Amino acid sequence: MPIFRFTALAMTLGLLSAPYNAMAATSNPAFDPKNLMQSEIYHFAQNNPLADFSSDKNSILTLSDKRSIMGNQSLLWKWKGGSSFTLHKKLIVPTDKEASKAWGRSSTPVFSFWLYNEKPIDGYLTIDFGEKLISTSEAQAGFKVKLDFTGWRAVGVSLNNDLENREMTLNATNTSSDGTQDSIGRSLGAKVDSIRFKAPSNVSQGEIYIDRIMFSVDDARYQWSDYQVKTRLSEPEIQFHNVKPQLPVTPENLAAIDLIRQRLINEFVGGEKETNLALEENISKLKSDFDALNIHTLANGGTQGRHLITDKQIIIYQPENLNSQDKQLFDNYVILGNYTTLMFNISRAYVLEKDPTQKAQLKQMYLLMTKHLLDQGFVKGSALVTTHHWGYSSRWWYISTLLMSDALKEANLQTQVYDSLLWYSREFKSSFDMKVSADSSDLDYFNTLSRQHLALLLLEPDDQKRINLVNTFSHYITGALTQVPPGGKDGLRPDGTAWRHEGNYPGYSFPAFKNASQLIYLLRDTPFSVGESGWNNLKKAMVSAWIYSNPEVGLPLAGRHPFNSPSLKSVAQGYYWLAMSAKSSPDKTLASIYLAISDKTQNESTAIFGETITPASLPQGFYAFNGGAFGIHRWQDKMVTLKAYNTNVWSSEIYNKDNRYGRYQSHGVAQIVSNGSQLSQGYQQEGWDWNRMQGATTIHLPLKDLDSPKPHTLMQRGERGFSGTSSLEGQYGMMAFDLIYPANLERFDPNFTAKKSVLAADNHLIFIGSNINSSDKNKNVETTLFQHAITPTLNTLWINGQKIENMPYQTTLQQGDWLIDSNGNGYLITQAEKVNVSRQHQVSAENKNRQPTEGNFSSAWIDHSTRPKDASYEYMVFLDATPEKMGEMAQKFRENNGLYQVLRKDKDVHIILDKLSNVTGYAFYQPASIEDKWIKKVNKPAIVMTHRQKDTLIVSAVTPDLNMTRQKAATPVTINVTINGKWQSADKNSEVKYQVSGDNTELTFTSYFGIPQEIKLSPLP
């Protein structure tokens, strides 16, 4: 390794007293395989910051405290055309496969840095990588950066996928995610020890500030092209669609636009408090928060202040692995979401402020924050490496811009801000284009930027263009809410579910409902009103949410945030907005739900809605939602969430720092909650045994084995499309769950299987399971009856008439025994060899950070032992249990089981006759011919239900298989059900076809998106 010359640099800086030792600079390589996840950073605030740099005679490197990104100094490079400086750093460029293995997600090694121009330069900065580079030697690979900009810009490229070939003969193809292809970067291998920065040759001289040069592992999806640098990844810019015919410029249309604008301003200044806004109204606090940013204007242009970064731009640093000095400087960054929230709070205060002096100060604060934001590189054409999940960071910038539009115009900043916001909105191009497509129903768009989109359009100064844009926006919102997106795309579904991340996801849909409702409300009663089809579809989704919430959604529907279930109370205002936007307002259904979840009375309704409306009663009966492979059974104030999963619906969402132990979230779960807080009912994370989800059949694993085998995302799907629920008469329901584990997933027993069925009717549910198998000889298989925290108000169990409050407590139950949990739910054991009941102290772990937790819990579970072979179980749950009632039910069971009868229970078919309701539920896990009073044959896997009432037979059927792929839309499935006897339809409105064939009747059900169909039959005379 040669000794690099630093003579010219040392003379310039007076910093170096000895020749540079090249070995010192390269002894700790970047991307060291022993510590691949620790980013290597040059930030010029460190000791001897230029030790690894050299320059030719036409370049001068100095340190400047004028502006910086990381720390208080940057590198100022004064150059003459074609001159260069070199960073001497050994790289061991990993393949994407090696990087991905180290991080546990699709990754790539990235080279990134920041640069600042005080004036645009008509030329390119050339970055070269090679071995023993000097100013005149040929490099092996590199890339170019266009310099025609002012302010800060960030450059970030994949060393495997974004470099251009120089003089080497290489197989210069992109590296696949598994690293099987060579790339320029990989062909360099461990040969790189020099990175050369070469000034444009076509410009006589200039100067550039450079800071925060970094080598790090980053997500392979997020090195985006922009106006400065070309990478393999591009985010196309927005092209506004214009609907035809366009509305003319008339006083009426302009007045409507102004009305919408004022409504929007009024909502954000004085309307409903935003759930995701840290509202601050204290002027002194706003000023102190502003002062903490340390923003000041520089004499010759630009600003200096704390560096701004989005919460997702943090990732490229791998902050958990930074050394202590780098971490300290990194921690001084300001998160853009907090910054733009302050901008909004200042803009809101500005609108409300009456004192001229105070108002002027707020205005100057806002304008300086805007200038700093732009100077930091948040401008049109600047990708800043990536700005994914932009809406969460920037949503309040858009709204503040509308509130401060006059001040921005006066300062000649509005056009630049408008262009910047439009540029960064391109992540939601499928929405901002306003042309309905498969990707146009993005719930995250509604959640974060839909109202901001409208605010941006209202800034358009040209009257005709502004009318066109708002009119197109209205048509787009109508279409986005109306369409059924194909495959797993975001949007509303025919059964009332609302999809995000390829599944029903209240954590995303609830705020999206609220914001979509507000948009419809803002546009109401104008030529720009949202169409009725969009309104109707949103109403269906929001009424469905009312059904599957109590008011929180159950743990099985909480996504990656268990014990933080979204509540309808957080989106109550959305029901008001949508009710008041009805064609004939208010819509009575939505208005009554609003009153109920807002705890408003009938007496208050007149002042709210202008007429007397009774608050909605809690839903009752059974509702199938196969868009989420779940069913909801409501009885009085209790809600039972029955949850399965299949090839179309994932079991749980597990992230790197979320829901690490959530594997069993959908394993035939049957969570019971009363109306109110789930925490108050014992659903507490501290001490929670993650193996024991209520109703689930699981292998009881130590936490280290239960922890997801994937370091990052796991959204496990089933091996079959069949698993889900059905309903009958809106009152009765059934779940069928076919549990089959994958064959090749670490820490998942490939031989773990179970068939689980539940029949729900009124105040009781019947649970049966069969074909329970496991090959794990060390871990017990269990079916959990319940698990609740013990608290002062949840401190009692009843077992066979005995009140239990002891702690600790252990006992074993068997067939015929009963117990009542601390929430008043009764459990009658009707077929099980061993049921364990426990009141004990439990030690567990937090789902996000794996830190220990502990708590006291009551639990009961059926113990299937280790390696069960075709094990089975049966039990009943009563939702209105008392010791007296459970004693009566146990007596009925002992008397020849007067409660229910299992007519069949094997790997192909489960049949349950509920004697209390006279409803029969059939889970056809396979097509089958059966011996039964009513059903003779079913030609496809299906859930069939029957109810005999006097002279009529009501039959429903469905397949929970949505018959779709992740890309292709769901299509209907025809189910043929042959029933015994000759019948005719007693329901003219039924869509079920029927035909008598010999002594039987053939029923043809069309199952679309798992929505059950039913028919009422009467005997042929």
From Swiss-Prot:
InterPro entries from the UniProt entry: Chondroitin_ABC_lyase, Chondroitin_lyas, Chondroitinase_ABC_I, Gal_mutarotase_sf_dom, Galactose-bd-like_sf, GH-type_carb-bd, Lyase_8-like_C, Lyase_8_C
Any single GO BP term: carbohydrate metabolic process
pH dependence: Optimum pH is 8. Is essentially inactive at pH 9.0.
Domain of life: Bacteria
Induction: By chondroitin sulfate or its degraded products.
GO cellular component: extracellular region; periplasmic space
Phenotype for residue 500 to A: Still active on both chondroitin 6-sulfate and dermatan sulfate, but with highly reduced catalytic efficiency
Site feature Important for catalytic activity, where: 653
Transport recorded as keyword: no
Keyword S-adenosyl-L-methionine set for record: no
Signal peptide stretch: 1-24
EC numbers: 4.2.2.20
Impact after mutating residue 653 to Q: Still active on both chondroitin 6-sulfate and dermatan sulfate, but with reduced catalytic efficiency
Record: active site: 501, 508
GO molecular function: carbohydrate binding; chondroitin-sulfate-ABC endolyase activity; metal ion binding
Dependence of activity on temperature: Optimum temperature is 37 degrees Celsius.
Coarse class of the protein's main subcellular location: periplasm
One of the Pfam families matching this protein, by short name: Lyase_N
Family per record: Belongs to the polysaccharide lyase 8 family.
Written domain comment of the UniProt record: Consists of three domains. The middle domain contains the catalytic site in a wide-open cleft.
Function: Endolytic, broad-specificity glycosaminoglycan lyase, which degrades the polysaccharides chondroitin, chondroitin-4-sulfate, chondroitin-6-sulfate, dermatan sulfate and to a lesser extent hyaluronan, by beta-elimination of 1,4-hexosaminidic bond to unsaturated tetrasaccharides and disaccharides. Is not active against keratan sulfate, heparan sulfate, and heparin. Is able to promote functional recovery in the injured central nervous system (CNS), via its role in the disruption of the normal organization of the extracellular matrix (ECM).
Protein name, entry field: Chondroitin sulfate ABC endolyase
Organism name: Proteus vulgaris
